[in-house]
Amino acid sequence: VGGYHICPRDQHGLTGPCAPSHDKGKDKMRKFLTGITTAAMLMGSAAYAETTLKLVEVITSPERTKVLQGIVDGYEAANPDVTVEIISLPWGQAFEKLATMVAGGDIPDVVEMPDTWQALYAGSGQLASLTDHVADWEHGATLTEKTVAMGSQAGDLYMIPYGFYLRAMFYNKNLLAEAGVEPPETMADFMAASAAVSELEGKSGYCLRGGPGGTNGWVMMAAAMNGTNDFFTDDGKSRMNEPGSVEGIQFMLDLYQKGYAPKDAVSWGFNEIVAGFYSGTCAFLDQDPDALIAISERMPAEDFAVIPMPVGPSGKAFPTIGFAGWSIFKATAHEDKAFDLVAALSAPEANGTWAKRVGVIPVHKGADQDPYFQTEQFEGWFKELNGEQYEPTTMPTYLEKWGYFASTVVLETSQEALLGQRSAQDLADEWAEFLTDEHAKWQAKQ
């Protein structure tokens, strides 16, 4: 027909194979049709994997990347039309590298967002609101209230936190039993228990962090005794030298100067306080869940437990909290698919896996019912997350010189005070003056 022959049908009525034709026109047409078919198949395949999402992780380690890749692999298997490209930035350079990417237009769809960066990116309008997405998400209602509060800025949700680094109190059961005291619930109990343990030969009550990274301890004690974790008054003045805060600073000085902490603790950092606890040198240690890794390797589980931070005269405690989570950049061309990825990363099962492997407290209601978390070692953190008398404290990292204050000013001046060279009031006044000035500079830029 028209220069082309029709092949005979087989017994099923289908066109059967034809003998090769020596007609050049037919060969050209066959090649043409084959080319069209191949192109169509390739186009169809491309359309099937049509979306690539760029995910940037910033708190990078081999273990974290391995866990993240495993969750992403499961997401890709369930969503064959989406490919996820993971970009791992080393933590020490992550802030600058992400800022450079964003400024250059190489903006990721999904980003691991530390708490200290959230105000910067959300405040400048660069993050997509997740409020409506979470409202429609099957697991949205199981996020704890503190999780939603921590991921929000100005009433909008810009991050789904994946876990918390929350400060709570480790205690050595054997030392408390030997000293004849119960786990402390109040600041007064804590001082009395520390004194009792310190009566034991070669033992101290508290693993005080007088060296690098000790700012959290001073802030928590000051807040507990002052009854508030607000850093500033409405008119911008630091609360650090209010009478209650001065009492909290004096509380820390008393622990050391009365001999309820080891003498060497004036220079102890993270490794030293953790070692001081698992070696049985001191009975109390305030730390985050990631300290469990080293402690659990060296102490039997039945020898220690974790309780909430002791409450002050107001009946409240203000444990410091750190967290990170998943955010979506507003510039993404695939917001719905990006949220599907965030939802997969944040689902209860995935979040539970992440929390166990990374060393954070999970974010969903009922997570404490997982047998892994139903231990005395995790009890204190879940009580803090679920109890109204515990208000997590976030540092004012929006202040330009907060890093300098925490790492240098507090370190140097508090060591002088611990050694008896300065008073609590003197310390509080210097800190308050510094913070009030920094707050004024920040306020002027708003």
Where would I find each of the regions flagged by the language model?
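Hinge/lid segment of periplasmic solute-binding proteins
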Residues: 115-168, 182, 191, 199, ...
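Extracytoplasmic "Venus flytrap"/periplasmic binding protein-like
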Residues: 70, 74-143, 152, 174, ...
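Short, solvent-exposed loop/beta-turn-alpha elements that line the ligand-binding surface or hinge
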Residues: 128-143, 210-213, 227-247, 296-299, ...
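Short, well-ordered beta-strand elements
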Residues: 50-62, 82-87, 109-110, 158, ...
